[in-house]
Amino acid sequence: MDGRENDYQWAGPYLVSRQVIAVGAQSGIEQMSDLAGKTIAVQATGKPEAIFLSGGENVPAFRNVISLADRGVQYAMLDCGYVDAVAGHEEAIRQYMKDYGANFRILDEPLLTTGIGVAFSRHDTRGLAAQLTEVVAQMREDGSMEQLVGKYLEVPAHSLEVEQLEQ
């Protein structure tokens, strides 16, 4: 949703999405600044790639940013020690760790935290965004949203902390 709030009518945010950095469990890398001079792998065309290639003030000077079409390859590269870190969607990294027994550690500081919502045309007159927002609020209140998200994520509460986005 971020940066596109005025382009659409939005229902949400209803979930929190975090882009994070993962390193080997035994790595001495503790924060993003420790990645200066290191090699990181990212998925091509993803948010981490855009952030790292833009070189903002909080982005360390990497030795190399490797952009890959298949995110599974970036995880395998970290697992084999070919790169010092990977960056991507937190839940995708956690799922890889679970599925393959990978011993990664996710840095505490997220690279990007954003809300996920449902977009409707700005010109829509059916009131769907408002209706869906109301239904999602009811689902949050009665616990059914956590139950639903819990079918797909190990710790659904992290993804449901949308109130944190406004702080």
Model-derived segments and spans:
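Ligand-binding clefts/hinges and TM-proximal coupling segments of bilobed small-molecule sensing domains
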Residues: K47-I66, A102-L107, V136-Q167
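Bilobed "Venus flytrap"/periplasmic-binding protein-like clamshell domains
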Residues: S17-G72, E90-R94
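Short beta-strand->loop
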Residues: Y8-V16, N64-I66, K98, A102-L112, ...
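Acidic, polar ligand-binding/catalytic clefts
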Residues: M1-D34, R105-L111
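Short amphipathic alpha-helical coupling segments at ligand-binding clamshell hinges
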Residues: D34, H89, D124-Q138, S144-L148
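A ligand-binding cleft/hinge motif common to bilobed small-molecule-binding domains
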Residues: M1-D7, I51-G56, M77-L112
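A bilobed periplasmic-binding-protein/Venus flytrap-type ligand-binding module shared by bacterial periplasmic
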Residues: Q19-I29, G115-T133
